[in-house]
Amino acid sequence: MKPGIHPEYREIVFVDVSNNFSFKTRSTMSTRETIKWEDGNEYPLAKIETSSESHPFYTGTQKIMDTAGRVEKFRQKFGTKAVAKASGDGAAKTAEKKAAAAEAKAAEKPAKKKA
């Protein structure tokens, strides 16, 4: 291996912020925060939203995990616009054009009388 091109592989503590579960492992992740671990040493700290202690697959529980508000962001961005386009001005204008065309066609053709 070439020296100086690889990231530092060191011990780091991960903390699940949803339930304060923490574990120490090795990683190349860089972080500015540190934490004092059970053995008295200080290690870099990485905060995560989900771990095996809080993920529904491993816990067997159902819970909504929309901590970042992704659904609301999506609805704000696309929800109201998509509904407005589908049932709004475009559909109304098309219906008006079709009705006007049908009326014009009916006015052009003279009514036939039965003799």
Curated annotation (Swiss-Prot):
Q: In which domain of life is the source organism classified?
A: Bacteria
Q: Does the keyword Ribosomal protein apply?
A: yes
The UniProt record lists the keyword Transferase: no
Q: How does it assemble?
A: Part of the 50S ribosomal subunit.
- List, alphabetically, the Gene3D superfamilies matched: Ribosomal protein L31 (4.10.830.30)
Q: Please list the GO terms describing molecular function.
A: structural constituent of ribosome
Which UniProt keywords are given for this protein, alphabetically ordered? Ribonucleoprotein, Ribosomal protein
- Give the encoding gene's name: rpmE2
An example Gene Ontology cellular component term from the record? ribosome
Q: Family, per the entry?
A: Belongs to the bacterial ribosomal protein bL31 family. Type B subfamily.
Q: Protein name, please?
A: Large ribosomal subunit protein bL31B
Any Gene Ontology biological process = translation
- InterPro entries tied to this protein: Ribosomal_bL28/bL31-like_sf, Ribosomal_bL31, Ribosomal_bL31_B, Ribosomal_bL31_sf
